[in-house]
Amino acid sequence: MPLRPGRCYRHFSGPAYTRKEYIPGIPQPKITKFTSGNPNGDYDYEVRLITTEIGQIRHNALEAVRTLTLKTLSKKTGSETSFFMWILKYPHHVLRENKMMAFAGADRLQDGMRLSFGTPIGTAARIEKLGETLIVIKVKKEHLEFAKEALKIASKKLPLRTRIEIIPLRLVRQEVQS
């Protein structure tokens, strides 16, 4: 059975379905690495991707965002040590699907809406408040435009609307030192 479009799982109602010890057969999330780059670098700016909607983001969308952002930043900056990227959301919520057959004679083979709880098909990260941060990228001043461009491209892979926020780190350090 093919993967349903992301719009089928964008909105949610009810509590999160997260108790993995009681749910058999949950597929592993595609996203496994949540940090990349050099965490100990001396950076000037922090660029954040912030959600402006409430909803769910599937694990494969998070992985697509991570790989696209990492590839764009590595290519533009020249190395993977000139930035630090951190994905803050983890896909805890288990998604279920009641598979329906759509061919001639399917009504004899399936149960319809009887026993329609569904089987686990994947996981999703829930965005439950407006303004939650999805991705943080720390860069030097010369790579600021590359980070903004990478997050702008990556936001197209997400089912929710987002905005980019830039926070200077140098000003904060200078105020603390004086």
Curated annotation (Swiss-Prot):
Q: Which Pfam families match?
A: Ribosomal_L16
- InterPro entries per UniProt: Ribosomal_uL16, Ribosomal_uL16_arc, Ribosomal_uL16_CS_euk_arc, Ribosomal_uL16_dom, Ribosomal_uL16_euk_arch, Ribosomal_uL16_sf
CDD domains annotated for this entry?
Ribosomal_L16_L10e (cd01433)
UniProt keyword annotation of Methyltransferase present:
no
* MF terms in GO: structural constituent of ribosome
| PROSITE patterns reported for this sequence | RIBOSOMAL_L10E (PS01257)
Q: List keywords of the entry alphabetically.
A: Ribonucleoprotein, Ribosomal protein
Which GO biological process annotations does it have? translation
**What is any one of the record's Gene Ontology cellular component terms?**
cytosolic large ribosomal subunit
Parts forming coiled coils: none
Entry similarity comment: Belongs to the universal ribosomal protein uL16 family.
Q: Which HAMAP family match?
A: Ribosomal_uL16_arch
| Name of this protein | Large ribosomal subunit protein uL16
- This protein's gene is called rpl10e
